[in-house]
């Protein structure tokens, strides 16, 4: 088990132990009650932390994409109806998450919805918060760790700069896990979308994705759709981020957390807290539109800005003169 995966495993045990507390939106960690300065000073301090860092580990989660318009996962937003309107009208679905886990009457309908979901993220342009973040990171030694499966970071950076530890919408896997391989989902998804036309809600039998080895139905290589394949590609993601952290442990690392919610704090947030505490020169910066969680143990090494992530990143970029 890699260094970072071991950290995640430890925090998952913590999550299980305090499950009810987490479900209520809380945390078992003792939080800081340190007063925040004025807004402009918060932005200035964040820009200073970024400027002074030798290296930055970005932890990008769902709130980052939501801030740029990818807010159709859990809410019936305009962006949801734009992409999934036909399914909302016919089935009463209110968000992409609900549709992804719906018990569909046929696999043809299921794949019509999943193809629409995957196509929406695969073809989405780079969202504004990601562009501002990219500008902020220019000239810095950085690495990206993400639980997002929407490929936004992959549209900006090469594979060796990003660890996607929860999967990627560009790939399929075998539902039976008969093989360790994942394979391209982009072209099959495109064909399914073409078959749907303007108003259909079911794909033909021959377009339902299947494993090229055993013929079993495939599903997206993302955690949550079933038996998530934690094979070679998955292990490579943890190896990349573990290697990067170990190579930079003695430097002034800034752990930059963006948009972590309360469903999966064990993948980015809590490991970042633990690493900030453990590394003598490390600092922690979180930007979140809802949650003001800064552990008391790192209150002198950390900062949380509560606000619109898109707005905060733009203001930090401007403060940096970029």
Each language-model region and where it sits:
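Conserved catalytic alpha/beta core of Sir2/sirtuin-type deacylases, generalized to analogous enzyme cores
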Residues: 1-322
């Amino acid at each position: 088990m890699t260094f970072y995966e071991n950290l995640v495993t430890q925090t998952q045990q913590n999550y299980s132990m305090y499950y009810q507390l987490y479900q209520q939106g809380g945390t078992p960690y003792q939080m800081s009650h340190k007063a925040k300065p004025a807004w402009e000073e918060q932005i200035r301090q964040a820009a200073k932390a970024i400027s002074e860092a030798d290296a930055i580990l970005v932890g990008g989660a769902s709130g980052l994409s939501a801030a740029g318009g990818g807010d159709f996962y859990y809410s019936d937003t305009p962006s949801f109806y734009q992409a999934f309107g036909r399914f909302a009208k016919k089935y009463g679905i209110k968000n992409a998450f609900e549709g992804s886990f719906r018990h569909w009457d046929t696999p043809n309908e299921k794949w019509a919805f999943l193809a629409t979901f995957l196509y929406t993220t695969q073809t989405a342009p780079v969202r504004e918060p990601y562009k501002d973040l990219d500008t902020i990171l220019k000239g810095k030694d950085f690495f990206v760790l993400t639980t997002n499966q929407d490929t936004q970071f992959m549209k900006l950076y090469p594979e060796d700069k990003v660890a996607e530890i929860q999967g990627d919408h560009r790939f399929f896997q075998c539902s039976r896990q008969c093989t360790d391989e994942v394979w391209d989902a982009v072209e099959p998804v495109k064909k399914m979308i073409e078959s749907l036309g303007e108003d259909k809600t079911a794909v033909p039998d021959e377009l339902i994705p299947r494993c090229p080895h055993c013929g079993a139905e495939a599903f997206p290589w993302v955690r949550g759709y079933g038996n998530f394949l934690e094979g070679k590609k998955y292990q490579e993601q943890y190896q990349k981020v573990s290697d990067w952290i170990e190579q930079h442990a003695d430097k002034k690392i800034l752990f930059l957390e963006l948009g972590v919610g309360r469903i999966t704090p064990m993948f980015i947030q809590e490991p970042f807290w633990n690493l900030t505490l453990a590394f003598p020169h490390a600092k922690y910066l979180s930007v979140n539109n809802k949650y003001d969680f800064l552990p008391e143990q790192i209150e002198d090494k950390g900062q949380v800005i509560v606000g619109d992530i898109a707005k905060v990143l733009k203001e930090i970029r401007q403060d940096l003169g970029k």
